[in-house]
Amino acid sequence: MLIKLLTKVFGSRNDRTLRRMRKVVNIINAMEPEMEKLSDEELKGKTAEFRARLEKGEVLENLIPEAFAVVREASKRVFGMRHFDVQLLGGMVLNERCIAEMRTGEGKTLTATLPAYLNALTGKGVHVVTVNDYLAQRDAENNRPLFEFLGLTVGINLPGMPAPAKREAYAADITYGTNNEYGFDYLRDNMAFSPEERVQRKLHYALVDEVDSILIDEARTPLIISGPAEDSSEMYKRVNKIIPHLIRQEKEDSETFQGEGHFSVDEKSRQVNLTERGLVLIEELLVKEGIMDEGESLYSPANIMLMHHVTAALRAHALFTRDVDYIVKDGEVIIVDEHTGRTMQGRRWSDGLHQAVEAKEGVQIQNENQTLASITFQNYFRLYEKLAGMTGTADTEAFEFSSIYKLDTVVVPTNRPMIRKDLPDLVYMTEAEKIQAIIEDIKERTAKGQPVLVGTISIEKSELVSNELTKAGIKHNVLNAKFHANEAAIVAQAGYPAAVTIATNMAGRGTDIVLGGSWQAEVAALENPTAEQIEKIKADWQVRHDAVLAAGGLHIIGTERHESRRIDNQLRGRSGRQGDAGSSRFYLSMEDALMRIFASDRVSGMMRKLGMKPGEAIEHPWVTKAIANAQRKVESRNFDIRKQLLEYDDVANDQRRAIYSQRNELLDVSDVSETINSIREDVFKATIDAYIPPQSLEEMWDIPGLQERLKNDFDLDLPIAEWLDKEPELHEETLRERILAQSIEVYQRKEEVVGAEMMRHFEKGVMLQTLDSLWKEHLAAMDYLRQGIHLRGYAQKDPKQEYKRESFSMFAAMLESLKYEVISTLSKVQVRMPEEVEELEQQRRMEAERLAQMQQLSYQDDDSAAAAALAAQTGERKVGRNDPCPCGSGKKYKQCHGRLQ
């Protein structure tokens, strides 16, 4: 009560921010007459003037009123469009490292030109981030005339572009691209073998469009660059044949874990577990298929990878559904993004899951991959000096933006008041009744000429509704991941009178639905249209536009509630833009995923008590409230998962930054001989210490062992025992010095053969290659550690602290290995002629190119229990009895594959 009273008196934080900014808007408006008087040349000259002022030390914020006034005037001259006051407010919000919540149709693309221009004046580059290539290209081309009029360059960063074109795009003042491409370029730059191969500049200012989609929905999606591992496609096919013999256990009995079924499915965590009965059957079937020998157990250490195949195949069959989670197109399994409903060409699930799905669908199985580099969007975008974003729906996630990205959310008012009617939800008992009610509603709406947009949560559901509409004889367009190319065209005409459009999730997001259809699209379809033709098209459109408004504007039908209220709001937000009329309603059934998992028992009990008849719907505030609570539960659970993921990833992130900065330093210098010399001293000291403990008696020395180690690891054949026999005065210190001096002498002789310059080049190559190879193994080991770390909780230890401690010691061990391997490689390599060094370099380049061609940019299935990635690389590595089992089950080794040992 008191808080409400204080808010009324002083205004909310949002009100106070807007009040402060409105004063600046008044200053900008006052400058308008002055700007109108300037010639085009004088207006263009303002950019150079602003840059000169910045160089003299003026603060960027002081330029806001004048810079925004210049952009507004330029936009009037180039586009004939004047920024509204609310767009100026949005521009200021975006410049202040905030999220601007601007409703659909309020002109976010035009708003973005203001902060993009202002921050481009620094010359450090501005990255405008969009959700797909089409929007990146569209926005760049639309805004290019404005920026070029003001003397700024514009670049577009698209997947598959050659490195020189990418470098040029990043060198531009303002670069447009997708979140995936920026992230992958960052990773690729940190795998480059020479400074010239890098494409990005230092990350300065990112302006993220649809910021909720990128920073929240995709936050759990690490970007992974992976190279090919060993081929095991045959095994996937063989294991796949066995899975149909298993029966799913309907209810998991947590006490005994017994039941009639062979495996249980946890839909919330997307995991599959074998029951005891299932384990026995699987072992029998594996023996029958000749995959496993009789008498062997699936839990024997030799079968760790087999267990991984079985788990992957089970998950592929039980949890992943065709046309919901993926589609099969041209003999390929293509992932469908669960948040946007779009296909993700080129992305692959990790941990063998993608191969298991390929085996299930009977398409060609592609090789498994090994992670070479990875980063989450959360950590990538936090690398920017300055970050801001805009979306139509951010307020529900304001707390997350603030706690993870330190970004405040400011709700920017609409230019015209909102008059859309959001009707209460209708809840049916079954899916079939719900679909029937939707068809009836569509018939009713289209009969009076009202356009309808139907939002579904998956391709499968969109095709189900489409089939029913076809049966009912209603013409309609389907917009889902399968028809990506026509997306914008279909959306542009979704406002046509009586048009019916079915869209998955947010397909077509970023394209406005204009009531009456898009007259621009009609004009674009004509070849060289005359002025009369254009006028006629506009006049026809005006008639249609008025007719649609009279019929009630665009009507939105939601066929199911999403896990997040925000995505529901996005669907609703497609209607009622710029103060237009519109309406929306969600249709639900007790068979919907959200209701089944989170709200079923209470609500269905309530509905039965009310004596529901088939085809009848319940429309009550209690039900709507129960659904909102279910969504809140899911949202908070997802937030906790993302927060947990970030806390764990922060550990890896610190290590990643350390490795990448060291790698970049290495790339930028041409001579690493000083580093090599200091590393050599450390390595030889540690090696000698292992055989001659410091300040020890001669009886404690292991001279034969030391001689053998120096010979095997450093190619140093030294008669140490002979020296000690012949020279009694040789003590520990002088012996150490002599061994080091001998190693330097041998190395210098090699250098004389190939020449100093060639040797420096070779040293740098060896360091880079060793660093990359060890970092790759370290990533797999970290992944592996992460899978079982939660079990430390049972030992009353904080898993997070344990993870930090262990990963730090692994990192320290990796750095020690790096030193050792570099010196060992350089000592053992036999080089005789400069040509041989050049040949080695050439081999390295060819290997890098081969890897680059085979690299996969993959989509990490975030809930997956990773398989024994490290075990696969290191073969028969000894696993401690209390370590997490390498099969990825999450159990201790002694309770899993170590049970029989």
UniProtKB/Swiss-Prot annotation:
May bind 1 zinc ion per subunit. It is found in: Cell inner membrane; Cytoplasm. Residues 891-901 have a biased composition (Basic residues). Pfam families: P-loop_SecA, SEC-C, SecA_DEAD, SecA_PP_bind, SecA_SW. Its cofactor is Zn(2+). It is a peripheral membrane protein. It comes from the Bacteria. GO terms for molecular function: ATP binding; metal ion binding; protein-exporting ATPase activity. One of its GO terms (cellular component) is cytosol. Keywords: ATP-binding, Cell inner membrane, Cell membrane, Cytoplasm, Membrane, Metal-binding, Nucleotide-binding, Protein transport, Translocase, Translocation, Transport, Zinc. This is Protein translocase subunit SecA. It comes from Escherichia coli O1:K1 / APEC. The gene is secA.
